[in-house]
Structures are given as structure tokens and as C-alpha cells.
């Protein structure tokens, strides 16, 4: 079995995920004398070599990302990537004009458009705040902040990737977490819940809908991978450090999809 990763983390605490970049991703041609890495090998290539974002940057400058397909049935996926450790994050995009590596100060990424465009559009929301707004419309008019949360009026609520980028960036940058690991885990899933996709709201074909298949995070110090699925809101966990990290065979766990309900009587 050869795994094709959506997201992954290594034992050093470096994590990486790929997201859709259809129409913008252009991979390079194979070049003699360079370390050519196929798109489907990119995540394991980085995570098997690097322990930090700094090391990933150095490796990226030496490699050539190519579009060799995994198989005839699975052509190269058009993706861009976020790479992060506990201190920083970067976004990697391979486009017609070459590879781009960006600092990612918000630590989030969604699908299209290119990252520079996503970051620039945050300027449109400079006035958003978690605090209640003050009247800046006119000192000649008396306004009433009739509801809590009005400081975030204008925060986009649709399911487009640009709007989800703004929404999850605002939520992440303004959220507070408790000090315990459980509190942090809970808060993480609440943050990503702000961009959850519900079946029926985003139709991609006749009768077919885009949904949030799963949501995941990892304690990179302990090697514990936490996840929920669309059908199961209960957080499941896999202790990856509890496995033999030198194992040559692929260790697999099935996604827990059935809803787990805690009965109180």
C-alpha cells in the first residue's frame, strides 16, 4: 500500500497539509541533476527529511516539484500546501512562473485563489473586531448596538474558499483557549467548525454536495492525532508514538464514522 496524504505530521513536530489549487497549480518538468519530487510524494518527502519549517525552506530551495501522476487512474492533484511547526508556518505554491514560498502569519489555508490574494483581501476586513462597535458613522446620529457580536458585522458567511479563509483567520486570531490540552483540543475543533461544510449547502454536481469529511489536529509533542468525521462529532484519538515508529509496514486505523452518543440515563 502507498498512502496518499491529505495531511500528515512527523515525530519531530513538523506538520503539512495539501488543499485544492485547481487552475493555478502548474508543476515543473523533470530536470536532470535536480532532486525531482512528484506531487504525490511531496508530503512524505518533506516530513521524512525535515524537523522544522526552517529546514523545510532549505529543502524546498533544492527540490523540483513535478507533475508525474500516481497512476493512469489518479492524475496529479492540483494543490497548494501549508507547512507548520510550533513556531511558524509557510505556504507553498507551484505555479506557471515557478515555486513560491510565503510566510503564513495567520497559520491557516483554504483552497483557491493564490495565497497572496487571500492575504491581501484581509485588508477589506480591517474594521472587524471581537469588541462591540462604536458609532463612527456620524456624530449627528444616535445608533444602538442592539446585539452582541456586531463588531464582526461584515465577516463573510458563505462557503467560498475566500470567505472561509477570512472567517477561519478571524476566528483563529481572536480565539482564546484554556491552558489544558483538552481545552486546546476543544477550541481547535470549534475554530475549524466556523468553516464546516454541511451536506446540501454546496452543490458540486446534480445531487452531490461538498461536505467536511473529517477535521483533525495533532499534539506534535506527544504524537497524538485527534479527529472528527462528518458522521461522528465525538473526538477520536490515535497515539502515534504508541506505535513502532520504525515499523516497515503501514499501520492503518479505520475512520470512526457512526455518531457516538453519550446516554445519560
Question: What kind of feature is each model-predicted range?
Answer:
Residues 1-34, 62-63, 67, 252-254, ...:
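A contiguous strand-loop segment
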Residues 15, 89-90, 99, 223-225:
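Hydrophobic residues embedded in beta-strands of well-ordered beta-sheets
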Residues 15-18, 82-84, 91, 217:
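Structural recognition of the beta-strand scaffold that forms the well-ordered cores
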Residues 17-19, 93, 226-228:
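Beta-strand residues in well-ordered beta-sheet regions across diverse protein folds
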Residues 22-24, 97-100, 107-108, 231-235:
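Short, surface-exposed beta-strand-loop junctions and turns on beta-sheet-rich folds
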Residues 33-69, 75, 181-190:
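Proteins synthesized as precursors that undergo proteolytic processing into mature forms
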Residues 62-100:
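Catalytic cofactor-binding cores of redox enzymes
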Residues 69, 76-77, 86-88, 109-265:
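C-terminus-biased signal that marks the final domain/tail of proteins
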Amino acid at each position: 500500500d502507498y498512502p496518499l496524504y491529505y495531511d500528515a505530521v512527523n515525530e519531530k513536530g513538523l506538520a503539512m497539509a495539501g488543499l485544492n489549487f485547481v487552475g493555478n497549480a502548474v508543476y515543473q518538468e523533470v530536470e536532470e541533476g535536480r532532486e525531482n519530487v512528484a506531487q504525490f510524494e511531496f508530503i512524505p518527502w518533506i516530513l521524512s527529511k525535515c524537523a522544522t519549517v526552517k529546514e523545510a525552506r532549505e529543502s524546498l530551495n533544492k527540490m523540483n516539484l513535478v507533475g508525474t501522476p500516481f497512476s493512469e487512474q489518479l492524475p496529479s492533484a492540483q494543490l497548494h500546501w501549508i507547512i507548520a511547526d510550533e513556531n511558524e508556518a509557510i505556504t507553498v505554491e507551484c505555479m506557471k512562473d515557478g515555486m513560491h514560498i510565503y510566510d503564513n502569519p495567520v497559520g491557516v489555508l483554504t483552497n483557491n485563489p493564490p495565497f497572496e490574494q487571500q492575504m491581501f483581501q484581509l485588508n477589506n476586513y480591517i474594521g472587524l473586531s471581537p469588541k462591540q462597535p462604536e458609532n463612527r458613522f456620524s456624530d449627528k446620529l444616535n445608533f444602538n448596538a442592539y446585539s452582541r457580536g456586531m463588531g464582526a458585522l461584515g465577516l463573510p458567511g458563505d462557503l467560498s474558499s475566500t470567505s472561509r479563509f477570512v472567517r477561519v483567520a478571524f476566528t483563529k486570531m481572536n480565539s482564546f483557549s484554556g491552558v489544558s490540552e483538552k481545552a486546546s483540543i476543544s477550541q481547535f475543533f470549534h475554530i475549524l467548525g466556523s468553516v464546516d461544510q454541511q451536506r446540501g449547502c454546496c452543490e458540486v454536481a446534480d445531487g452531490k454536495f461538498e461536505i467536511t469529511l473529517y477535521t483533525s489536529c495533532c499534539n506534535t509533542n506527544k504524537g497524538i492525532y485527534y479527529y472528527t468525521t462528518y458522521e461522528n462529532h465525538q473526538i477520536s484519538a490515535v497515539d502515534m508514538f504508541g506505535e513502532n515508529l520504525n515499523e516497515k509496514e503501514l499501520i492503518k486505523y479505520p475512520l470512526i464514522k457512526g455518531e457516538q452518543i453519550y446516554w445519560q440515563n
